[in-house]
C-alpha cells in the first residue's frame, strides 16, 4: 500500500477577486485540476516566463478538466492586503496586457493566498489535483515544457 495518499495535503480554499470584482474561490473548480501562478509586476523572472505560461495556456484552455489561473497581491485598499507584494490593480492589469496574458489574473484578498500557500518568492507555481490536494509547488521560473509536464502529472 502507498502511504503517499495519507500524506496528501488539502489545498486551502482561497477567496480572491477577478478583474471585474467578482469573487473567485478554489472550491468553484471542485473536481478539476488547478494550476496557479503567483507573480508580481516588478518581478523579472515572472515577466520572462509569462510567454511560456501563455503558450501553455493556449494549448490547455479548451481542456475542461484543467483550470489555469494567476494570482497577484495588489496594494489597493479594496483588497485589504496587510502586506501587499505589488503595486495597484491597474498597474498589474496593464503589465499583463502588455505581455499578452489572456489567462485569468486574480487578486489576493486579506493576504489569504500568500499566507496559506506560504509564498516566499516570485514566481511560485501551485499545482492542485482534482481531489483538492496539492500535487506540487515550484518556486522560480518555468518553461512551457516543464509546466505542461507538471500539469499532466496532476490526478
Residue ranges of each PLM-predicted region?
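A short beta-strand-turn-helix
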Residues: 13-34, 57-59
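Conserved redox-active cysteine motifs that mediate thiol-disulfide chemistry
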Residues: 38-55
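Thiol-/selenol-based redox modules, centered on thioredoxin-like
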Residues: 121-155
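N-terminal targeting signals for export/organelle localization
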Residues: 1-13, 155
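Short pre-active-site segment immediately N-terminal to redox-active cysteine/selenocysteine motifs
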Residues: 32-34, 39-42, 75, 121
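Short, internal strand/loop/helix patches
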Residues: 84-128
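Short, flexible/disordered intra-domain loops and linkers
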Residues: 75-87
Amino acid at each position: 500500500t502507498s502511504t503517499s495518499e495519507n500524506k496528501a495535503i488539502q489545498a486551502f480554499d482561497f477567496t480572491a477577486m477577478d478583474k471585474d470584482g467578482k469573487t473567485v474561490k478554489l472550491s468553484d473548480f471542485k473536481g478539476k485540476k488547478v494550476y496557479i501562478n503567483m507573480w508580481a509586476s516588478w518581478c523579472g523572472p515572472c515577466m520572462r516566463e509569462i510567454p511560456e505560461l501563455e503558450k501553455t495556456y493556449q494549448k490547455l484552455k479548451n481542456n475542461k478538466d484543467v483550470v489555469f489561473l494567476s494570482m497577484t497581491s495588489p496594494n489597493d485598499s479594496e483588497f485589504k492586503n496587510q502586506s501587499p507584494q505589488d503595486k495597484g490593480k491597474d498597474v498589474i492589469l496593464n503589465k499583463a496586457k502588455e505581455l499578452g496574458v489572456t489567462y485569468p489574473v486574480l487578486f489576493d484578498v486579506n493576504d489569504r493566498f500568500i499566507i496559506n500557500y506560504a509564498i516566499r518568492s516570485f514566481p511560485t507555481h501551485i499545482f492542485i489535483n482534482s481531489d483538492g490536494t496539492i500535487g506540487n509547488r515550484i518556486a522560480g521560473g518555468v518553461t512551457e515544457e516543464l509546466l505542461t509536464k507538471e500539469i499532466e502529472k496532476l490526478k
